[in-house]
Amino acid sequence: MEHKGTKILKTQRLVLRPFTTADAEAMFENWANDKEVTKFLTWTPHRNVEETRALLAVWEEESKRPDVYHWAITLQGEVIGDLALVAVRGENAHTGYCLSRKFWGKGIMSEAYAEVLRYLFKEVGFHRIESSHVVNNPASGRVMEKCGLRYEGTMRKAFRLLSTGEWEDIVYRAVLEEDYFDRK
């Protein structure tokens, strides 16, 4: 495996690229301030665009490292979501993603995720990619299923929603390198 970092990736409709601080307004307006989008995430909605800009400054600096994988999902030049490896352990990684609510249900996240999996397995050489979702967010699970991630188990009350303080069950899914190439 050879780390290659956040390279620009293209699909039929999307360009996936590293974030810059210039994305702050679009990120804030499209999802960072939206309570519905951030409900199942590990961070609360941003209160203002400066909070978003500060986060993007960190992400922009981190993206210079070859072992960091964090993409801005863009559609016709507009930043509409993000997809990242939130944990890398050797040749295994855990992904996380979110998308502007106005683009839900259009196959965009599945398209972006499929391209990232292609890159991670074919070009970088990862062995295993996993992800998880709150049981009450089945749409996220459908994205994973469409992209070949198999159900591995449910952890009971393993995630506390920041919005309500309630504990939620988490579903884990993963795809192995050999599973990925068997599907192709």
What are these model-predicted stretches?
Residues 48-50, 63, 163:
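A short hydrophobic/aromatic micro-motif that marks alpha-helical segments and, especially, helix-coil
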Residues 36-58:
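Conserved GNAT-fold acetyl-CoA-binding loop/helix
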Residues 1-26, 30-35, 70-184:
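Acyl-donor (CoA/ACP) binding surface of acyl/acetyltransferases
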Residues 31, 41, 63-64:
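Hydrophobic residues in alpha-helical segments
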Residues 57-72, 81:
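A short helix-loop-beta-strand connector motif used in the catalytic cores of GNAT acetyltransferases and
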